[in-house]
Amino acid sequence: MAIKTLLQFMRGFFAALLLLCFTTGCSTWKLGKSGQNKIAGKTYVIIGASSGFGRGVAEELGRYKANVVLAARRTELLEEIADTIRNSGGTARVVTCDISKPEEVQRVAEAAVTQYGKVDVWINMAGVGAIGRFWEIPAEDQVRVIDVNLKGFIYGSRAAVDIFIKQGYGVLINIGSVDSETPLAYHASYSASKAAVRNLSLALGQELRLNGYKKIKVVTIEPWAVDTPWWRHAANYTGVEPKMALMDEPDKVVNAILRKSLRPKKIVPVGWKAKASSFMANVFPRLNEHITANVSQRYQMEMPPAAPATQGALYKPMEEGKGVDDGVDERMKEEKKMRNKQKKE
């Protein structure tokens, strides 16, 4: 009888969880006409605009007739994106920037204010990773992850807040990850950096509130694993091509970023998988950590095809991986077909 009651409780519990995730999924919907009109004429700074979420957000902002300051290391690619924005009705300024270098981040801030006189939204989007067993990844590569993902966000956040305090308002958006609550096996330094970004944003938001800057908001966007060039650009010491189960499409994250630039919220897990992961991390932390680690073992160490070790885009930009998405999901489907074919043979 007790087991039956427990099973009934668990069914109801997970049904309620799924309902919560479904009903809170509107943040991933595309902006309506009213939201698009609110963005028109606003100035957005995007550091990490050359691919992935950054490129997706930039191109959408162009369609909504925003002013966009594009910053990343791949200047020629930024110029292409700037042309797309201008052809869509927006305006754009390109600034070459490595977010780990404070003087280059400051140059982005100065260019934005000089050109547009204000910054409404500043987005720290640049990010790198180093995947593999912690003891097999060179220490300098892991430090580089911290240089970009944490120190770079400190430089970007400081530059943004300096502008916002002078003008009296603004929205700072830092891109985090579900890894901030559920550290992922074989992503040790990346998970550490994203946990730090979450706490940086929360602490900064409280400092602004306590000092009377109520019109300055700080947002942390926390996606699930997403099909972007991040996987191609990450340093990889696994011996295979690492991926993740149930990857999301980048448009979900792009839409969430744009929505929260208008209606800021402290922490934004994107989509039902990220929300479920956050819930499990807080309610069933041991179980969640165990399941996530096992999934990572399968998808990032055992199942993918072999690949050579690489430093990816840690130290210098790569030619490959220019789009918003990177076709990871399609490659996974093809790999599954090949495995099934080999089993039959």
Give names to the regions the model predicted.
Residues K65-I81:
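Conserved glycine-rich Rossmann-like NAD(P)H-binding loop of the short-chain dehydrogenase/reductase
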Residues R133-F134, P138-I146:
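Substrate-binding pocket helix/loop in short-chain dehydrogenase/reductase
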Residues T43, S50-S51:
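Conserved glycine-rich cofactor-binding loop
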Residues S157, S193:
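Active-site helix of classical SDR
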Residues T75, T96-R107, A139:
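The beta1-alpha1 cofactor-binding region of Rossmann-like NAD(H)/NADP(H)-dependent oxidoreductases
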Residues L210-M301:
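SDR active-site lid
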Residues S177:
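Residue(s) in the substrate-gating loop at a strand-loop-helix junction
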